[in-house]
Amino acid sequence: SIGKDSTVLLWLARKAFFGHVPIPLVHIDTHFKILEMIEYRDALARQWKLEMIYGENVDALCAKDTFPDGNTSRIQCCKNLKTEALKSVLSGDSIRYRMDRQTGNYEPDKNTEPFTGVIVGVRSDEEGSRSKERYFSPRDKNNDWDVADQPAELWNQFKTEFAPGTHVRIHPLQDWTELDIWEYILRENIPVVSLYFNRGNGTRYRSLGCAPCTKPVESTARSVEEIVAELKDGKFSNIA
């Protein structure tokens, strides 16, 4: 989403590889994201010299099988525009679009090889299903997740080998909290999209997604320092 969590994940990758991210960045474009998110994504990709790729569910968009078009539920819309789109992008079954960093334009990606692993910036405290994920979370040959078939992870022991034709999702931020994220952003001075801050109307976004389903919260926080204070001792203290 190029929100705070994925931006922190990118920052960690840049630190690990001395300012360079040697793997593609995949974004799923639902076409309902807040415009500032897309603008920020592209600006960051050019500034940090990221190998930026995006994918989409063209069939669902053309059929208007979406919640904003009034033809399906929010949950089914998320499945259509996010889950199914991600599956086809990872498998290489749908068109991927790659950014030309010189022009900022996107062109169909000639590489259709499947991705066998993807690093994701989800956190266990975001919602129930994510709390059941592992650091190394396998998907089967249909890209489906069997929550009952998760490998045990004890201390620093992780299963990192998986069957051919499957892929693994890696969650380095699994045990980070929202406060951890913002404290790290403050410590490292990481840039984030301005939607997270009160810009004079008494509201800001705590999380970002599609415009029809993402709503701002009442807040006076205009800076990272004020967001940290709000999460530590303010109105959002201990509230997910």
Residue ranges and their predicted role:
Residues 1-240:
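Nucleotide-activated chemistry modules centered on ATP-dependent adenylation/adenylyltransferase
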